[in-house]
Amino acid sequence: MAYELSTLQLSCVAFVAFMAVLVFRTRTRNLKQNVPPGPRPLPIIGNFFDLPPKGQPEYLHWFKHKDAYGPVSSINVMGTTLVIFHDKDAAHAVMGKKAQKTSARPQLNFAQLCGFENFLITHQYNDKYRLHRKMVHQEIGTKGLSAGFRPIQEQESIRFILQTFNRPDDILQHLKTLAAAIVLKITYGYSIERKGQDPLVELIEHAMENLSQAFVPLAWAVDSVPAIKYLPDWFPGMSYRKTARKWRAINEAAAELPYDFVKRQMAHKAHQPSYVSNLLEKHMIKSEDNKINVSAADEEAIKWTAVSLYAAGSDSTVAIIHSVICGLVMFPEVVTRAQEEIDRVVGSDRLPNFDDRTNLPYVDGIIKEAWRWNPVGPMGLTHKSEEDLVCGEYLIPKGSYLLPSLWWFLNDPKEYPEPRVFKPERYMEPFNHPDPSEIAFGYGRRSCAGRYFADASVYITVVQLLAVFNVRKARDDQGNEIPVTLQAIPGMVNRPAPFQFKVEPRSQHHIDLLRRIESEQIPEVSHASLLKPSTV
């Protein structure tokens, strides 16, 4: 979603001018109290034109502010202050140490109309959020709990390896299948359709695409000019309401259909243990008819935290593994050293597993380096201050949007020398650089609840890929290697721009291993036909 001043916004300025001036004057009084520096605002609209332009990733746009205005800078849009942190210590002081006062989310009118306020990552910091996060934490929030899902992750990784063996040119689609299969099986005990498009995957991915657009601060007219929400539907430019109603229906279907699937499977005692079935069993209210009944509050929490797991896990898993592949292609010496370690520790007669990780420090470093080199959330998700805060010499006004540049914290050459080099050994002796996961998974009480689960999915996929495949640059028709660079593309989830690469088995011995593993696989029956048809 681009930041653009639309015709609607311009036409509404006159309608809301008086209110806007009042709000602007009230809120910008704080500007005299030494808020962080930034570009000079225009009357009424403030720094609207200083928001990221269409087609540019946010973190690259805000990075320019670091050199122009310092490590903590700000802009003001229609009376709302945005504070951008390129100072890790300052960000930690505000969003870590003062998490109780800075864990709120911006009140985005458009996202709320779409129903995204039900997703865990977009909840306000309140009792509902704490209940939902506690529910997730109790099921997958620790290393021990996430270890219980390893058999599923390992099996799906093997399927990914075999799909790549048979159709290497479709590896990115195989990655999407892998991520969806893991999350849906763990969350709902649902087996996806592998011979075509799965209806549940399609539905939830549609919801995630909408989320990415809806949750960009001040990108929608009703967020930058809130007064227009009081205008009638017939007023020019109110089409955003039709979009919001459509997206809300998609969100509700994405939450309801798989939840209903689990309940029906449990009623027939045909369910697979999953996040949803485990919680239903824990919160079930006994009844004479043996139906699966839970309180309305528990049902809402189970239903929406479940779909939130997909929102947080699937897209980010694909993005980070794609970044690993980019790093391997750009720095071929990493592939060589990783394969030497795998061959020495594991051998070449089986695939690596989770038990091998502690003996594969270089491969473990590849996973750490991926989270650092191209973080999935380079600006995190926006926090909001709930009261005036002091940050060093600056005042952060109540209601400010807080944007930490996680990308810079993880690419600061003072912390990570040669930051644009993909260098897994930086976490080993004698370098011992800081573990990037402490930053990459977010701040304070908004940190990713499924971080151990996500990291495990990435590890098992990458280590098994490297064990049997060479990953290298593609060649053109003249046999010359095609150069690869890491290019950013805009979006809430950071992923590499498309690039060409080649994946092929390492040797005939590895081909034989893959064929043996393939012969041992038991076909899986899809649950797609058991879903109730969606009306969306």
From Swiss-Prot:
Tell me the leader sequence span: none
Q: Which Gene3D superfamilies match?
A: Cytochrome P450 (1.10.630.10)
Name assigned to this protein: Multifunctional cytochrome P450 monooxygenase af510
What is a single molecular function from GO for this protein?
A: monooxygenase activity
Q: Which GO terms describe its biological process?
A: fumagillin biosynthetic process; terpenoid biosynthetic process
Q: Which gene encodes it?
A: af510
Q: Which SUPFAM superfamilies match?
A: Cytochrome P450 (SSF48264)
Pathway-wise, it operates in: Secondary metabolite biosynthesis; terpenoid biosynthesis
Q: Where are the transmembrane segments?
A: 4-24
List keywords of the entry alphabetically.
Glycoprotein, Heme, Iron, Membrane, Metal-binding, Monooxygenase, Oxidoreductase, Transmembrane, Transmembrane helix
Q: How is it used?
A: Fumagillin and its derivatives have been intensely studied for their potential use in the treatment of amebiasis, microsporidiosis and rheumatoid arthritis. They have also interesting antiangiogenic properties by the irreversible inhibition of human type 2 methionine aminopeptidase (METAP2).
State the function annotated in the UniProt record: Multifunctional cytochrome P450 monooxygenase; part of the gene cluster that mediates the biosynthesis of fumagillin, a meroterpenoid that has numerous biological activities including irreversible inhibition of human type 2 methionine aminopeptidase (METAP2). Within the pathway, the multifunctional cytochrome P450 monooxygenase af510 acts as a 2,4,6-trichlorophenol monooxygenase that first performs the C-H hydroxylation at the bridgehead C5 position to yield 5R-hydroxyl-beta-trans-bergamotene.
The reaction(s) this protein catalyses: (+)-exo-beta-bergamotene + 2 reduced [NADPH--hemoprotein reductase] + 3 O2 = 5-dehydro-6-demethoxyfumagillol + 2 oxidized [NADPH--hemoprotein reductase] + 3 H2O + 2 H(+)
Q: Which cofactor does it need?
A: heme
Q: Which family does it belong to?
A: Belongs to the cytochrome P450 family.
Name the Enzyme Commission number(s) assigned to this protein: 1.14.14.184
> What turns on this gene?
Expression is controlled by the fumagillin biosynthesis cluster regulator fumR. Expression is also under the control of the developmental and secondary metabolism regulator veA. Expression is significantly up-regulated during infection.
Binding residues for heme: 448
**Enzyme class of the recorded protein, top EC level:** oxidoreductase
Q: Which organism is it from?
A: Aspergillus fumigatus (strain ATCC MYA-4609 / CBS 101355 / FGSC A1100 / Af293)
> InterPro entries annotated for this entry?
Cyt_P450, Cyt_P450_CS, Cyt_P450_E_grp-I, Cyt_P450_sf, Cytochrome_P450_fung
Recorded phenotype for the gene knockout or disruption? Completely abolishes the production of fumagillin but leads to the accumulation of the intermediate beta-trans-bergamotene.
The cellular location(s) given in this protein's UniProt record come to:
Membrane
Its cellular-component GO annotations read:
membrane
> Where's it mainly located?
membrane
